[in-house]
Amino acid sequence: MAKTIPRIGSRKNGRIGSRKNTRRIPKGVIHVQASFNNTIVTVTDVRGRVVSWSSAGTCGFKGTRRGTPFAAQTAAGNAIRTVVDQGMQRAEVMIKGPGLGRDAALRAIRRSGILLTFVRDVTPMPHNGCRPPKKRRV
């Protein structure tokens, strides 16, 4: 009879420490994408690997309430709370989009205690590229 090979990484052993929380991140980049319908806040390290993210929809806001400034403030607070626990002290902020949540998200980031090195607006602007869609008639 063949001998059974003992499994080293079996489920019975469980996790030997969570790998995600072991990495300390002193500096990062906070990306805020504010559209008219939703606000998405993504926190990455300086190389661009996602550490934490949150949106107004994941915070429990549904429908038109996702585009409100309060929803953006809540989403930014949720995304930043996890990275502050991982040791982030300094961050750069990139804001994209025309939505109502731009200023509210930035206000929540400032209140979190993270030192901001710079705030940059990276909203894509066409240099007369594609023709825009026709105007809405309501």
Curated annotation (Swiss-Prot):
Gene Ontology BP annotations: translation
**Gene encoding it?**
rps11
Q: Which InterPro entries match?
A: Ribosomal_uS11 (IPR001971), Ribosomal_uS11_bac-type (IPR019981), Ribosomal_uS11_CS (IPR018102), Ribosomal_uS11_sf (IPR036967)
The lineage is:
Eukaryota, Viridiplantae, Streptophyta, Embryophyta, Tracheophyta
* Annotated stretches, region: Disordered: 1-23
- Where does it live in the cell? Plastid, Chloroplast
Q: Which family does it belong to?
A: Belongs to the universal ribosomal protein uS11 family.
| Assembly | Part of the 30S ribosomal subunit.
Q: Where is the composition biased (Basic residues)?
A: 9-23
Which cellular component appears as one GO term in the record? ribonucleoprotein complex
Protein name, per record:
Small ribosomal subunit protein uS11c
Keyword terms, alphabetized:
Chloroplast, Plastid, Ribonucleoprotein, Ribosomal protein, RNA-binding, rRNA-binding
Report the GO molecular function annotations.
rRNA binding; structural constituent of ribosome
Keyword match Oxidoreductase: no
Question: Which SUPFAM superfamilies did the record assign?
Answer: Translational machinery components (SSF53137)
